[in-house]
Amino acid sequence: MTTYGTNQKSSNDLAPKLEYITRGINQHKRSGLATRRPWKQMLDLGSFNFPRKLATVITRIRANTVYFQTNYTIVVLFSVFLSLIWNPFSLLVLLALLGAWLFLYFLRDEPLTVFDREIDHRIVLIIMSVITLSILFLTDAKLNIAVAIVAGALAVLSHAAVRKTEDLFQTDEETSLLNP
């Protein structure tokens, strides 16, 4: 029996490539989401009080920005998203740029290769930053984006300043004991 004209590849031939792609995405999602803290812990009203000294404020801001880094990033990005709802073209541009950042920088395990040459991740970072700032500068939402970033940063800094840090590491130890 001849097999002329039939496709010899089985559907499983694509499995290793697909597994490689999804493995990279899953590792990055896990590492990024692993640092996201529960919103209930972040907004626990019993963990707020006003500090008496400036040194305490600085210490709290440093500790909380490291501990709640992913949550704070989500807050600022949500602020930018809300500011762009009234400017749909800029919102689409921002979403396209976000996709480009994810594809070219964040979800990449190996260096970017163009014409059989590896591009260093710092070069990609610089080029993507320049392109992002240039494109957002050309949209009509410059003021909206600037105000949203400042508002998000003020919300983050005010939360970080009044959120007590004594229970942060205790909670980390408890969760590490539960999940060895």
Curated annotation (Swiss-Prot):
Keywords for the protein's UniProt record, in alphabetical order: Endosome, Membrane, Transmembrane, Transmembrane helix, Transport
InterPro entries xrefs: Prenylated_rab_accept_PRA1
Domain of life: Eukaryota
Tissue-by-tissue expression: Expressed in hypocotyls, leaf bases and shoot apex.
Membrane topology of the entry: Multi-pass membrane protein
Similarity comment text for this entry: Belongs to the PRA1 family.
Identification of the protein by name: PRA1 family protein F1
Main subcellular localisation: membrane
Subcellular location per the Swiss-Prot or TrEMBL entry: Endosome membrane
GO cellular component: endoplasmic reticulum; endosome membrane
Native source species: Arabidopsis thaliana (Mouse-ear cress)
Protein function: May be involved in both secretory and endocytic intracellular trafficking in the endosomal/prevacuolar compartments.
Assembly and binders: Interacts with PRA1F2.
GO biological process: vesicle-mediated transport
Transmembrane domains' residue ranges: 63-83, 84-104, 123-143, 145-165
Pfam families for this protein: PRA1
